[in-house]
């Protein structure tokens, strides 16, 4: 009888651990920013000149919808536009959807963007070309960063 109870409890424990593992895996799968930010957020402001000011992570994520033509937006490479990032951003909460064609200038006043893998920033598997200029923005990529000097500052590299 004791053996049967032990076997039953072990089976119950095993089944419970499988259920917990499956739930944990589902919870750990991140949503994409483009599925979460579905309308233009307050942190994405378009000026009269067409240039863009971004003040929060949701505003930066809205670039995905604009460039890739998602969430009711017509695809726009932002050619000739300047994107000014005014605050540090943490993009680690959701997965980034790679940008297709992107032709803008990104400027920041020595701001930092965390949690955005640079290798997934752009969709390099399509025929689009990328022309962009980045100033004063640091991308933190898993304990190291790529720094771009602020406008007017000289780079240490020759």
Q: Which sequence ranges carry the predicted segments?
A:
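Surface-exposed repetitive/solenoidal architectures
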Residues: 26-158
């Amino acid at each position: 009888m004791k053996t049967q109870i032990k076997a039953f409890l072990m089976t119950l424990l095993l089944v419970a651990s499988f259920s917990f593992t499956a739930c944990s895996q589902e919870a750990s799968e991140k949503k994409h920013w483009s599925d979460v930010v579905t309308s233009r957020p307050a942190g994405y402001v378009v000026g009269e000149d067409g240039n863009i000011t971004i003040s929060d992570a949701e505003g930066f994520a809205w670039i995905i919808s604009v460039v890739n033509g998602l969430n009711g937006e017509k695809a726009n490479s932002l050619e000739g536009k300047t994107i000014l990032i005014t605050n540090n951003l943490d993009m680690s909460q959701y997965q980034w959807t790679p940008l297709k064609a992107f032709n803008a200038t990104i400027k920041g006043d020595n701001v930092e963007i965390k949690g955005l893998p640079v290798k997934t920033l752009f969709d390099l598997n399509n025929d689009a070309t990328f022309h962009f200029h980045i100033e004063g923005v640091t991308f933190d990529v898993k304990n190291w960063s790529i720094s771009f000097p602020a406008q007017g500052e000289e780079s240490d590299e020759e």
